Amino acid sequence: SISTNDITYVEVFDHNLVYHTTGGDYTVRGRLGDVYEQLDHDYFLACNRSFIVNLRYVTEICTDHVILNGTKISVSKSHRKEIQSRFSAFMDKRAEKV
């Protein structure tokens, strides 16, 4: 069992889900939409039809991509505004806790 806190991002590849975690990568059969429904939307965001990222690990947001742990992930046009606003809100919340 994988802790959601350890998931950096999830990608779908050839009908498989690849969970990229702080402890390594795990591949299982499944649908990205089903996984997204189960994750906490305060922390997890869909960047495009193939990737879900954990905001805890995002280090940079650009117009058309996000960077987390050195990995560049494309952001589709339809998700750009949501990702920028949700990331800003996430960072504001994080700053309040400090």
Located regions from the model:
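Conserved binding/recognition cores within well-folded domains
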Residues: S1-L68, K72-V75
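Eukaryotic intrinsically disordered, low-complexity regulatory linkers and tails enriched in Ser/Thr/Pro
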Residues: Q38, I67, T71, K77-V98
